[in-house]
Amino acid sequence: MIRNRNAIRLLCLLCLLVHPAINVNLEAQTIIGQRNDSVSHPLIRHQLGFDIRPGYIVSTHSFLQGDNAQQKKIDQSLSFHFKYAFRFGKESNLGRLFPHTYQGIGVSYHTFFSPVELGNPVSVYAFQGSRIAQLLPRLSLDYEWNFGASFGWKKYDELSNPQNVLVGSKINAYINLGFLLNWQVHRYWKLAAGVDLTHFSNGNTHYPNGGLNVIGGRIGIVRALGADEAPGSITPGWLFIKPHVSYDLVIYGATRKRGLIGDDVSSLIPGSFGVAGVNFAPMYNFNNYFRAGLSADAQYDESANLKEYRVGEFYSGDLKFHRPPFRKQFAMGLSLRAELVMPVFSINVGVGRNLIYSGDDTKGFYQILALKTYVTRHLFLHVGYQLSKFKDPSNLMLGLGYRFHDKR
């Protein structure tokens, strides 16, 4: 029953994430500026794509090096991707603000050539890409990120899959970043090839959570649907925002697992623990694509500093704890934030340090990576992850945010 509830939560989250990507009538960002000329241009351009992505699995554990049922290395992967995307037309405000950006949803099939122990998962994800540099009239250097959920993993099981200590859940996050050479071979056709990085994990919601990392290549084709401008055609002038300060308020929550190491024994604390937090960040909008600022962060973690309140002297067996006082599980800090701004989505990164805390678990630096998905002009979904001390997995950050004084 608990597994079913977790699956339903992840499915609902994924639906909420991709819904704005396909709802092209967002009040937030699709105010259209029609021109009074005799030429009609589509306000939304659609495209379909197909990718093949071979990869090398980074060897992070003995399971991948041969300590598995096959008794051989697991170091190869292959995936097939089918994608739908749209771009805002050159006559729309967003098309003039972000003339080379596309976004959409994709479905992919992955194999690691170990179906019994890892499975052959299927991913559903949102994605977005844009141009980094125009190299030649028909050749550009682009980037593309993918973010979603992957289903159908074979997870760790003490009896049936005891050596797989990398995957602790049947559903895992799928994160990918690629850099591509994009060649316009025809008015309607593009060829793309490049390199990418992929990460699979469950966000510390289940143990084990070793995760899987892939370095690979990719080659694909894209077919534009309907009318499109020919390469070198004249487009309307770009729009540029005026620099200004906006304010982001985010409220989030999640659950997490917690393990303890003591007396040379590694133990998993039974059950899940709640996490809740709030961020308030004044952000200076430098240009169309970038804003940065300082965020005041507060977080309560129900699993923090439990080690100090353990009942008994041993780390093995049935672990029990007294409930720590609130001050031991609450922390406040400041973080530097930078954000890549695009239509529909923004990517936020932060590095911070707790200033008000009590206990080792809340001491020191923390790092944040978050995806913001706009639902209205000011309201956005927040899906993030937090690390502690630059290396320790901490918790998901699933919530809602609101932007004040947005002059875009």
Label each region the model flagged.
Residues 58, 91-93, 183, 187-191, ...:
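Repeated loop/turn-to-beta-strand initiation elements of outer-membrane beta-barrel proteins
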Residues 44, 74-80, 118-124, 169-175, ...:
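Residues that define the transmembrane beta-barrel architecture of outer-membrane proteins
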Residues 50, 80-86, 126-132, 145-149, ...:
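Residues on the lipid-exposed face of transmembrane beta-strands in outer-membrane beta-barrel proteins
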Residues 46, 52-70, 93-96, 141-175, ...:
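Outer-membrane beta-barrel translocator/channel fold
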Residues 213-234, 393-408:
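Outer-membrane beta-barrel "beta-signal"
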Residues 57-79, 117-118, 257-279:
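Surface-exposed strand-loop-strand hairpins of Gram-negative outer-membrane beta-barrel proteins
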Residues 42-48, 97-103, 137-143, 187-191, ...:
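Outer-envelope beta-barrel architecture signal
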Residues 48-56, 107-109, 143-151, 193-199, ...:
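Transmembrane beta-barrel strands of outer-membrane/channel proteins
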